Amino acid sequence: MALLAGSLLGPTSRSAALLGGRWLQPRAWLGFPDAWGLPTPQQARGKSRGNEYQPSNIKRKNKHGWVRRLSTPAGVQVILRRMLKGRKSLSH
């Protein structure tokens, strides 16, 4: 009976019947096959990444500026070390 129904259906319906209803599955499971040949779910898109660095000139100058460098002995060493190396920019 299935063979008879398959022969009566058109080519598009027959290909859908051969897929075993795969076109009815959720779209997330129709990903590319993984190393074992199994379909993998698509990656969730809810979480954003890579936006941790939001530059602020005030914070940059306060942390790495000339006044902050000269206010501590370690900062003076940083300036002298950069002078010795020949850096054009000694601080921010």
Curated annotation (Swiss-Prot):
GO terms of molecular function: structural constituent of ribosome
GO CC list: mitochondrial large ribosomal subunit
Primary location recorded for the protein, binned into one broad class: mitochondrion
Modified residues (Phosphoserine): 71
Domain of life of the source: Eukaryota
Keywords, comma-separated and alphabetical: Mitochondrion, Phosphoprotein, Ribonucleoprotein, Ribosomal protein, Transit peptide
Start and end residues of each stretch annotated as Disordered: 40-63
Family note: Belongs to the bacterial ribosomal protein bL34 family.
Record protein name field: Large ribosomal subunit protein bL34m
